[in-house]
């Protein structure tokens, strides 16, 4: 009940007469994962995603589905956090579907969890793109819909990490 109230209150942050709004979600209650999926599935022309740990089959499927419908999907991930079997398998699926993936090892960790959608919407928060974030961890997601000025700032940050990254080579 508290989660529904918080999501409702966050949705009230709408600009009168406009489409700009902010929505929040939480896990493990389930609203974080739903919000991430809705945001990714809303993309029409671009998804620029950056993450720390990456193992979520649902996110992999959403990104591949977006790519197949013509969305330009690019992903930049922390190098050290994605050496396990589940991460390697998830990233290989993306690359084998034609999605560009780069990994970054310039910082101690690249702890960003961000998706920039169509250069106007930003999804961010503590939520890693993992099953643990969905099912076990206490996490949060914030989506800022139709906020191109905010999206531009995040896109510049995303681009700085993308330019530091090394292209992922599929291991199968």
Please place each PLM-identified region on the residue numbering:
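Short N-terminal segments immediately surrounding and downstream of signal-peptide cleavage
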Residues: 20-44
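Primarily the HKD phosphodiesterase
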Residues: 38-99
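Structural recognition of the beta-strand scaffold that forms the well-ordered cores
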Residues: 23-25, 48-51, 74-77, 102-103, ...
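Sec-dependent signal peptide recognition
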Residues: 2-9
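Signature of lipid phosphatidyltransferase scaffolds
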Residues: 117, 121-172
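Solvent-exposed loop/turn segments at secondary-structure junctions
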Residues: 53-57, 79-83, 107-110, 121-122, ...
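Short acidic active-site motifs
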Residues: 31-35, 58-59, 110
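N-terminal signal peptide c-region/cleavage motif recognized by signal peptidases
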Residues: 13-19
């Amino acid at each position: 009940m508290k989660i529904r109230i918080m999501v409702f209150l966050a949705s009230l942050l709408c600009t009168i007469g406009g489409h700009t709004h902010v929505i929040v979600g939480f896990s493990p209650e389930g609203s974080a994962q739903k919000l991430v999926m809705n945001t990714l599935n809303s993309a029409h022309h671009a998804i620029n995603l950056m993450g720390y740990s990456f193992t979520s089959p649902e996110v992999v499927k959403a990104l591949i589905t977006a790519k197949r419908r013509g969305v330009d999907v690019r992903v930049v991930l922390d190098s050290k956090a994605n050496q396990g079997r589940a991460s390697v398998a998830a990233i290989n699926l993306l690359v084998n579907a034609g999605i560009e993936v780069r990994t970054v090892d310039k910082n101690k960790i690249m702890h960003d969890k961000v998706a920039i959608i169509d250069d106007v919407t930003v999804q961010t928060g503590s939520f890693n793109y993992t099953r643990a974030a969905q099912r076990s961890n206490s996490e949060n997601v914030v989506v800022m819909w139709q906020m191109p000025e905010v999206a531009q700032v995040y896109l510049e940050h995303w681009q700085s990490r993308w330019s530091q990254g090394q292209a992922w080579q599929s291991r199968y």
